[in-house]
Design a protein with these regions (language model features):
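Hydrophobic, small-residue-rich transmembrane alpha-helices and their short perimembrane loops
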Residues: 49-63, 67-70, 74-82
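Conserved G/P- and acidic residue-centered "switch" motifs that form tight phosphate/ATP-binding loops
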Residues: 65, 86, 119
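Basic, amphipathic juxtamembrane/active-site segments
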Residues: 69-110
Length: 206
């Protein structure tokens, strides 16, 4: 499931719910999304019934994150500065949320390190391709939309069925999520690197 490939189909949904957002500057929307991500990270760390509010925070952060680009295009305020701010805040949001999972009593700092670096490398490879003249690379199994969906699903699992068992590692919904992000993150980063490198190598030969 690669939800980033469905972005063009989301335009109708954004049109339907986006009118109230058109009066808000796009950069402000980006900052609001980031603030919800920070709050969600703290709530995830706290655990317990706070996870319900963490789920809502992730949902709101995702909504505002989708809206900033939509509003920028609709109001003619799209800019490189806004895009740069949006991507910077997205990475900080990723760190804040995954840090909440990592330092949670149900998480793992060690798995969290690899999950965070895997996610950051995934995003870096996507935008680095664009910086050298290619299209932004969304290839792979762990785009940002996918990550946010997985996060919300595993928060629900932790609320409903908070299992905990050991087999070399301590497995909880949170550690399984971090392990998946670590593995899928590096696989996605490698996939994006390989596809971009091949395309660049082909340009040099032509």
């Amino acid at each position: 499931m690669v939800l980033d490939s469905l972005r063009p189909r989301m335009s109708g949904f954004l049109e339907f719910i986006g009118k109230p957002f058109l009066r808000i500057p796009p950069n402000t929307i980006s900052v609001i999304s980031f603030l919800f991500a920070i709050i969600s990270g703290v709530l995830i760390y706290e655990g317990g019934f706070f996870l319900i509010f963490a789920f809502l925070g992730i949902l709101l952060s995702s909504l505002f994150d989708a809206m900033d680009g939509f509003v920028a295009r609709k109001t003619g305020k799209a800019s490189k500065a806004g895009d740069f701010l949006d991507h910077t805040l997205d990475r900080l949001s990723d760190i804040a949320i995954l840090a909440g999972f990592s330092f949670s009593p149900h998480g793992s700092i060690y798995l969290g390190f690899f999950a965070i670096t895997g996610v950051l490398m995934t995003s870096y490879m996507g935008t680095q391709a664009q910086s050298v003249g290619l299209k932004r690379n969304y290839r792979g199994v762990l785009g940002r939309a996918d990550r946010l969906l997985y996060i919300m699903i595993f928060i629900i699992v932790q609320i409903i069925y908070p299992f905990d068992f050991s087999y070399y590692l301590v497995f909880t919904p949170f550690t399984i999520l971090l392990l998946w992000f670590a593995l899928a993150g590096y696989i996605t980063a490698a996939s994006r690197f390989t596809s971009s490198f091949r395309e660049l190598s082909g340009q040099n030969k032509s």
